[in-house]
From Swiss-Prot:
GO terms for molecular function: ATP binding; ATP hydrolysis activity; transmembrane transporter activity. Belongs to the ABC transporter superfamily. ATP binds at residues 38-45. Keywords: ATP-binding, Nucleotide-binding, Transport. PANTHER family: ABC TRANSPORTER ABCH.1, IMPORT ATP-BINDING PROTEIN. The keyword Plastid does not apply. InterPro entries: AAA+_ATPase (IPR003593), ABC_transporter-like_ATP-bd (IPR003439), ABC_transporter-like_CS (IPR017871), ABC_transpr_LolD-like (IPR015854), MacB-like_ATP-bd (IPR017911), P-loop_NTPase (IPR027417). Residues 2-221 form the ABC transporter domain. One of its GO terms (cellular component) is plasma membrane. This is Uncharacterized ABC transporter ATP-binding protein MJ1508. The keyword Nucleotide-binding applies. GO terms for biological process: transmembrane transport.
Length: 224
């Protein structure tokens, strides 16, 4: 489904040059639950962003279903990000002036869905993540765990095939974190591919594949 071949990411030049990723080679199959792990600064988020087409490699290629993503137009890349992918971040990135329902509707507005469809689907998704009684709450009226569940519902708005999650439990207490992981596992069991960055070893029980990074290099790939 997604493949990286000889991917490098280099920032700066000369003495200021920083190598964030070194010769990354990996393959992610449809339906896998992949965890990218390693210490802070090892290149986890950089790799996730490149696989998600939020960033481009300095050298090497990323393929989606056999096609070089470097050959995609900017419009095709935008469609990949908007329709094929869903994104969940550590900081939630909810819009403070919108309700939970409106935050989930937003990707569908960008996709020009009609209002009745948006409202019905957003309500259904929030009910699915256990927030049917929080539809009209604003982010500041929700706990961290509830905000992350809104973010998951938003990520699902356009029926993505892949969810990219960057430390989705990083700002949550253990109970809320486990609730989020349970939701992600359930989505994976329905066929959605999950690619997730984490440094929490105890979460590896949810993964079908673990990619371990150190200093920008893959040091181990574990298929469970």
């Amino acid at each position: 489904m997604i493949e990286a071949k000889n991917v490098w990411k280099i920032y700066g030049k000369g003495e200021a040059k920083t190598i964030a990723l070194k010769n990354i080679n990996l393959k992610i199959e449809e339906g896998e639950f992949v965890m990218i792990m390693g210490p802070s600064g090892c290149g986890k988020s950089t790799l996730l962003n490149i696989l998600a087409l939020l960033d481009t490699p300095t050298k090497g290629e990323v393929y989606y279903k056999g096609r070089r993503t470097s050959s995609m137009s900017e419009n095709e890349r935008a469609i990949f990000r908007r329709k094929i992918s869903g994104f969940i971040f550590q900081q939630f990135h909810l819009i403070k002036t919108l309700t939970a329902l409106e935050n989930v509707e937003l990707p569908m507005m960008l996709d020009e869905r009609d209002k009745s469809y948006r409202r019905k689907r957003a309500k259904k998704l929030l009910e699915m993540v256990g927030l049917g009684d929080r539809l009209n709450h604003y982010p500041h009226q929700l706990s961290g765990g509830q905000q992350q569940r809104v973010a998951i519902a938003r990520a699902l708005a356009n029926n993505p095939k892949i969810i990219f999650a960057d430390e989705p439990t990083g700002n949550l207490d253990s109970k809320s974190g486990m609730a989020v992981m349970s939701i992600l596992k359930g989505l994976n069991e329905k066929g959605i591919t999950i690619i997730m960055v984490t440094h929490e070893q105890e979460l590896t029980k949810y993964a079908s594949k673990i990619i371990k990074l150190r200093d920008g290099e893959i040091v181990e790939i574990i298929n469970k």
